[in-house]
Amino acid sequence: MTENNQDLKQNWTRHREGVVQAACGTQLTAKSWLTEAPLRMLMNNLDPEVAENPNELVVYGGIGRAARNWECYDKIVESLTQLNDDETLLVQSGKPVGVFKTHSNAPRVLIANSNLVPHWASWEHFNELDAKGLAMYGQMTAGSWIYIGSQGIVQGTYETFVEAGRQHYDGNLKGRWVLTAGLGGMGGAQPLAATLAGACSLNIECQQSRIDFRIKTRYVDEQAADLDDALARIAKYTAEGKAISIALCGNAAEILPEMVRRGVRPDMVTDQTSAHDPLNGYLPKGWTWDEYRVRSVSEPANVVKAAKQSMAEHVEAMLAFQQAGIPTFDYGNNIRQMAKEVGVANAFDFPGFVPAYIRPLFCRGIGPFRWAALSGDPEDIYKTDAKVKELIPDDDHLHNWLDMARERISFQGLPARICWVGLGQRAKLGLAFNEMVRSGELSAPVVIGRDHLDSGSVASPNRETESMRDGSDAVSDWPLLNALLNTASGATWVSLHHGGGVGMGFSQHSGMVIVCDGTDEAAERIARVLHNDPATGVMRHADAGYDIAIDCAREQGLNLPMIGR
């Protein structure tokens, strides 16, 4: 390391005590709602109710951060408070690098996180850059400032479990149970999603603090003392037809093989540990968490090797369940790839959740549409829930989701909601929300965004674009085009990331957020962005030859030159 690099490293801080929370109400810190919104959502990502490790700037997903370091965070906040409505802030891997004059309909913030030239797109190279303070892993919604806690993935997981139930169990999961692991920011959605889908679940987690948090927020119902206790509870509740979620503190790489040895038969098996990041997200069997964190710094190569070997045993157990006739699927954490790299040749024998259950929704531009109330008032979310029902009156499944969400989901940080809606519906809802702000029905503006896990915004051959009909799994032009189009359409902030969900070298993806501030100008931007964004998903799947997408494109009047209208 050069002397200059040493000086650079001494000038940044990853750990800082204190509490970050978004402001609420209508008083602005920034110059307008267009800059107040990204400021509040950045802070909301680091709210202790939202983030997994806010003192380290970690929001979720291993080391998915909101800013590169605390010095960068402070400068982002300062830049946003001073930003004018004809300027754009550029953020490079969590670091504010420039403010440029643009125009009022341009994004206020453009973000690029953890993008590497493909030949160098590996965890090894990224970790070198990260250690020098030259990069930041943004995951998907951590570095793009639109994470809303575990609710953000609950409905997607719920839709997956419901569709799996429809395919394998005649649409009825009563008396059935799901076996899974991981109760972090993403995996923490699984127990509640299973409950809402009507199934029991056994959720293995190696950190007691995560179990405590999921019980506190009502995502998990109970904790078992050990495996025997857990299986006894599962047997009792499934016999009674109750949908109860049970947590078990332990290591999935040890517990799943033991369940296979015992001949235990779940009704569904998946996994949402942070297997995408073996250095920071997957505990090797036989290790304590504290030992893992220390050795991750002192001997990273050995840690990665041990983690991948444990993943191999985990995946071999999942394969055994599948071979026993139990529906088994990867939930997008790249655990199959990690196992394959250390010798599990048939790791991909069980499918990913997108090709198995979700792709027909993507073909119609349906995906994780989300919004947050900048007022901090839950009533604003309840009013928007009612508006969704009013504007989409015939979708009983969606109405049922909204009712269950209100009853069961605890808000984390700023009140927010997610619901899976598609092309045509998103723009209709966004314009209605903007009008509610204009009329005063909502007490402050709302922001509308989505997960990067959406129909047109991601290239991820082991997850969202696995087994594409035309073989275009690894073509990453599509998320780049999505980001460019959202920028041209006037989204309030746009992000382009690499490595989210499945880790370095395995994905590229883009995100957008738009502010509904009640103005005519906002309405024009909303109409463009919330049409064009899901339309790219329909376009992408139509181009790959999916009839559902081609039909949707024709119904919606999309101008796709290579697809006859």
UniProtKB/Swiss-Prot annotation:
GO terms for molecular function: urocanate hydratase activity. It is an enzyme of class 4 (lyase). It is found in: Cytoplasm. Pathway: Amino-acid degradation; L-histidine degradation into L-glutamate; N-formimidoyl-L-glutamate from L-histidine: step 2/3. Residues 463-472 have a biased composition (Basic and acidic residues). NAD(+) binds at residues 61-62, 139, 185-187, 205, 210, 251-252, 272-276, 282-283, 331, 501. The active site is at C419. Gene3D superfamilies: Urocanase like domains, Urocanase superfamily. It catalyses: 4-imidazolone-5-propanoate = trans-urocanate + H2O. GO terms for cellular component: cytoplasm. Residues 453-472 are annotated as: Disordered. Belongs to the urocanase family. Catalyzes the conversion of urocanate to 4-imidazolone-5-propionate. This is Urocanate hydratase. The gene is hutU.
